[in-house]
Amino acid sequence: MTNQYSILFKQEQAHDDAIWSVAWGSNKKENSETVVTGSLDDLVKVWKWRDEKLDLQWSLEGHQLGVVSVDISHTLPIAASSSLDAHIRLWDLENGKQIKSIDAGPVDAWTLAFSPDSQYLATGTHVGKVNIFGVESGKKEYSLDTRGKFILSIAYSPDGKYLASGAIDGIINIFDIATGKLLHTLEGHAMPIRSLTFSPDSQLLVTASDDGYIKIYDVQHANLAGTLSGHASWVLNVAFCPDDTHFVSSSSDKSVKVWDVGTRTCVHTFFDHQDQVWGVKYNGNGSKIVSVGDDQEIHIYDCPI
């Protein structure tokens, strides 16, 4: 337990190229936590976080091109990765073996996300569709069509009701998952939406854009509830803290910022990376943040809780 923000651990040369994505899960059996990273070096790496340090568990080979997105199942020891090779791969975190490879088709799979029940994997495509794959079947179950541009980012709401997508032209779409209907189209940004994240109570959606702004939306009414500035360049990633009170952002200005949801203010900035920071995530209880970037490093920070 700590009462201030500080950098706790640095893994230098974690990959041989830029690290574009990170996920954080917990291993209940071993009382340890798992960090998964995806890099332009074509590798997915699985790290164990225990005793305040990272140990490399598996280096997963299979992708033919850079890995752009990783996620960890909420229910099983499985990770998913998507790559510029247009394949999604599922990995067993307990033995480091590939479970299956899914051909995402001629349109690149970009960001991917497990559904809250982890039975599905959603991924955005170049043609404005969100494709939903069955984790068990490995097949495309259905698509949601934004009728828009290349989808860079997607997120499920934790309550399983909504799926949000962010496109290269700054348009955000929110779908009702049960009906497949498009509920809201939000036009708050004029530049690519790199990342979006729902609050744990599914009431708010936070969006990150190349315009340098972070926006907070009230999901139910699609109202803009806040515009936050502070990053000096593109905002590349946002992730909510499990306690609903804070979220974290990362940017090509090389910084990681922690924001207070209630006051809409930045409460801490980390300047520890040497290059743009592509990915940030909280751990399960919100006591730690992980960040990854073009400097090939993984950083773990302590948060006051």
From Swiss-Prot:
It holds the Pfam family WD40. The modification N-acetylmethionine is found at residue 1. SMART domains: WD40. Component of the PAF1 complex (PAF1C) which has multiple functions during transcription by RNA polymerase II and is implicated in regulation of development and maintenance of embryonic stem cell pluripotency. PAF1C associates with RNA polymerase II through interaction with POLR2A CTD non-phosphorylated and 'Ser-2'- and 'Ser-5'-phosphorylated forms and is involved in transcriptional elongation, acting both independently and synergistically with TCEA1 and in cooperation with the DSIF complex and HTATSF1. PAF1C is required for transcription of Hox and Wnt target genes. WD repeats lie at residues 14-57, 62-101, 104-143, 146-187, 188-227, 230-269, 272-305. Component of the PAF1 complex, which consists of CDC73, PAF1, LEO1, CTR9, RTF1 and SKIC8. The PAF1 complex interacts with PHF5A. Within the PAF1 complex interacts directly with PHF5A. Component of the SKI complex which consists of SKIC2, SKIC3 and SKIC8. This is Superkiller complex protein 8. Its main location: nucleus. InterPro entries: G-protein_beta_WD-40_rep, SKI8, WD40/YVTN_repeat-like_dom_sf, WD40_repeat_CS, WD40_repeat_dom_sf, WD40_rpt. SUPFAM superfamilies: WD40 repeat-like. It is found in: Nucleus; Cytoplasm. One of its GO terms (biological process) is nuclear-transcribed mRNA catabolic process, 3'-5' exonucleolytic nonsense-mediated decay. The modification N-acetylthreonine is found at residue 2. Keywords: Acetylation, Cytoplasm, Nucleus, Repeat, Transcription, Transcription regulation, WD repeat, Wnt signaling pathway.
